[in-house]
Amino acid sequence: MHRPPYDARMRVLMPVPDRDFDVTEVAVPWRLLTDAGHDVIFATERAGTRPACDPRLLTGVLFGRLGAAEEPRRFYEELNRSEEFASTVGWADLAPEAFDGLILPGGHAPGMRQFLGSEVLQRQIGGFWELNRPVGAICHGVVVLARARTVAGGRSVLFHRRTTCLPKYLERSAYLATAWRLGRYYRTYPAYVEDEVRAALAAPDTQFARGPRVLSARGTAADDTHAFVVQDGNYLSARWPGDAYLFGRRFCEMLEAADGA
């Protein structure tokens, strides 16, 4: 049954670490969801923490390059001034049933480990997954789902799902191009993201989709030519910041479909 118009505003949960998340992967979905009339509720490990992005992505990772594009940076500035960004909910205090959708953004700098490795957050996400509501993950955010377990059976929630994530070749290329100056900045963990995600799948050769090869070309607000996402039922995944606009638009469509179910 279609929900009445007064209930069309959906509540989307977006957990983030205290620092080092990706500018584009947070700010673009936030902007698109907000423009569509939805509420985005941010969650940090401790309630009331004002989170901060990876600062290198605002100025350029190396020689002013490899950072976020101008529009996502502007979106982030708007987000950083918003009330919801300072009024975060604590991970342990989350009630999964209170949200209509869940987005897990990525990032690769060291501060992301707080988010990627939290067993508390993984349990909460496992609980939300059981509700069969829209879930989206982009880049390293897919790792959280790979580590989250179903309530029954103890397998990853992704075990039977099709998915993408940050491709191994892209993570490796970024590391090799910058290691001389930034060390392991692009290597969040010794294992590559793709390797960990594939290991969580029942049949990785058929369930995992790497997508077209990219190195620098990105999707934009007006052009999805270089963007790629994978949708499997209520689950949506994307590879990197270059997919963020398509990812955000598709997630809005998933919310609308869920609202009309």
Report the location of each language-model feature.
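Catalytic nucleophile serine of serine hydrolases
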Residues: 139-141
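Glycine- and acidic-residue-rich phosphate-binding/metal-coordinating active-site segment common to enzymes
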Residues: 134-135
